[in-house]
């Protein structure tokens, strides 16, 4: 069955559902609620006020936004606004200019917000660059003329040495100790700030932002407090020497900036769709200021961050990135005209025989990405299981270990951006760093670069995900740059050994043939592409870093090979892997699923539903208090289960609270969810009270104190998305991706049979993958060696052995220092059969049950 045959079936399913519901209602009765923009203009019900809509649209923490209903509410808000100001909008003449001015302001409000956001992001990035460079250099020495200057500013214009910049002592060992304790101090301050004031400031934030833009609600993750702590702790974490970068956190604080500024404008405060546009544009600006690449930032936002990216969002993302980079260039934090330290320009060309080495760099990038992602997830699981109670200790120990390992290596002890600036350069023009370009030092440099590549890779694996602001872009680029420069030096040595070889026949004799700096540049692009699984945006970012069209083709080849190699080891970059690890309800547009099963295999059967009439209000309140369901299907009665609509948890809670505040709820009051049931209740009340039907309307009953029946029909969605139980699961997942509903109801001939959410789809996907892994494990030789029984004792894992080793070392060290060994207690989180604690019977994905939320490696 193909997708072209499924779409008409889905349309027929919805049309039949509408016809069935309409057939149950008299044609002269309007069923649209006042908050529904589908209501006719002559509807006699009072229009919904904007305050009511804003209350309904408040989403709870760890819930998903229903983009379909959000669009409905936004249209209703606009209609209510037009109705409330109808006299003002109709004015012309002397008052017409006021209307036109207001319309112009409302239309240009988005551009005002984007401009303010871009300016704030650019200014914040410039300040962070200046602070980071000074803190990184202060561990190595100080400026005797001005303590507040870093090494580059202190030595500005110096040609033969720099007497103004002094190391802390003249002894190498004392400088080593000072470097070590400086790293401990900076990392401890960063970890304490994050743990005490803003736990959400830890980590990179890109994976969470992807989920937030897709509609996942995480209150506080983009708040002002997170923005402040992230901006303060990020320079401290980078300057401590940890193998973490600022590019991922730059996206986080940029999106925080966009969220905070947009909240001052009512157009965005109550509109999730509008806010999504600003968040997407802010993410583009964050990448733009991090790499000095405005076009690359826009493409990164398109390729990686947003599931929904219309042309309007593209243009605003471009403008926001333009404003941010313009402000950064105006501040000019490095006083060189460069937006980032490692910008470089190449005036040489490449040769076709170098394609062999370029392909090798691409293979390295793919292998690096697969290796780091695999082992970083193992470290994340270990961190969650054993180290969640000691986030500060973990960060300090990592910083100390990094300082001990990195200081002896000339490429590891300096800042990673400064390292890439050195490795990217051509040797001509006086660009020499500690003999890097000297032929007699060639093989010692190769050895140092190899050590730097290996150590940096290991440090990236154990550092990314610790409880400080930590990105992985620049550390990966640093690994690729050191490996690429090493390859470039060896190729240069090969050429100098065999200059007359036919292999190098295309080289000109009067100019250098091999430029090792270009290999470092391409290696950095390969490693970045390997860890993120991106292609187009990485190519453009690397192009904007060099400004040379000459190296577009080599960059495309390297990135393409990296992508091909990386896909052999699994789909998705590090951000996608962390989303899966944390169990967030996120469906990636880049994934293609083939299950060949109907939606009934993944749906939640027998969901809790509400009868359309005669349902006690007290029972509804108990229902809300006793469970965390985020919505309820409404059926005619619980016996027939004929579907009539759907009401969300927020809507039901607001309706009950509003009725109680207005004194319309009696102790034995009952709620109705359809107009037919409401009118039937009015008729029964009228017959009992012996009033005329014409005078005793339902509105009058509602206005009387202690009404026996309360009408909630205005809060019910009477046309929810529905599918047939035999509808393909793949098509249902596409509906979630393209339309963004919170829940899709499953009905057969009008009868409710179940419901399906994003988490239902993910649960089924994980179940299928687990079965495939089990099948592969049972067919392996190791399984046969165990006797072919699944109930054998589970062998000790690598994480368990590593934890026992840490306990032994900690006990030995504490015993030598204090005389009494201290044993770290076990903190074992029970293994879950599923990636997130999803209850078996629930009504939607609304609440992600993140057990031990503090234990999450990136989301404390």
Each model region followed by its residue ranges:
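Alpha-helical transmembrane segments and immediately membrane-proximal extracytoplasmic
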Residues: 2-639, 643-660, 664-702, 708-717, ...
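A structural signal for short, well-ordered beta-strand elements
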Residues: 613, 722-725, 754
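Short beta-to-alpha loop/turn elements within the nucleotide-binding domains of ABC transporters
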Residues: 647, 727, 756
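Acidic, serine/threonine/proline-rich low-complexity intrinsically disordered regions
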Residues: 782-806
